[in-house]
């Protein structure tokens, strides 16, 4: 994330101790004037000089400091990730001491009532030398996937006497996306490809060459067949690598994520519907992530939410990253958009053997609202998984 150029002026405020010293200085000064005692005038001047030094040091310490954040490539909900906050001191001679940086994060939602602001995260930088940088890290865990925004970093210092607090705010606005949590698939998930559970272990250990042509190498993973270890490349790389084969088109899974809007005004029902929606999104994200990382097949996902989209033929981690970002931002709109998503799939494939629909409503509700005589029918069979009815528990265990 880009650094912020700190041209914001530094403001100073009295601390409790500073107010006490200021009160003492005024009291001593008034007493010295009334009594005409020179020693009291000197004492009052000394106290005021200390406050003046404190004010100048606070202001000069923070001027010129810039902040910079580093985030991981991918972040998932309910899984902690580290945020690096880097402070750079470009000044030639003056360092910075006892700088407290406070960060805050806000969950950005289409529903204003759902927006949440985190507690302030404080990090103390004991010393930042001239022309140097200092790094602090903090761990962040989000309970929901979606878009988040930094509200800005506030740098403060009370150095050297703690009588005044220098404050320099840094404008926020930087956003980042937290991808859905990745759960675990049960062995029964292979049924979605038309593979019987009894043959699951056999299919996992079979040679990948039965499914296509050799096209590259990849790192060895537990469960891979030793028959396909490429020994020459393994010796050269000093690690086990195996041959990788192009998957057959028959192992393509076409998924439609149906985020049906809730029409109920009851808050408890809406909260329950939101949980089912998040469960459906996490299941599709886990499915796509597993297929892309295991080189098992190809997956195409169409999302029927407020803005229907389609992401086709995901078969690598780099491709699945974009899909996970899109799933993180998926949310139901005010209207049913499943017909628009079906149109996107129909234009992409023309004909589909098996269409898997992951929905937040029962199939009966879909059939009652869409007349089969007028709706687009381009699939030979349909597998309907209703998250609200617990259909996903057979194939999926959510992340804790």
Predicted regions and their residues:
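Alpha-helical structural motif
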Residues: 25, 48, 213, 227, ...
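A generic hydrophobic-helix recognition signal that picks specific residues
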Residues: 28-29, 251, 353
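Acidic, glycine-rich A-domain
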Residues: 289-400
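Secondary-structure junction/capping motif
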Residues: 9-15, 275, 336-340, 391
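An amphipathic, basic-hydrophobic helix/alpha-beta surface used to engage anionic
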Residues: 39, 49-310
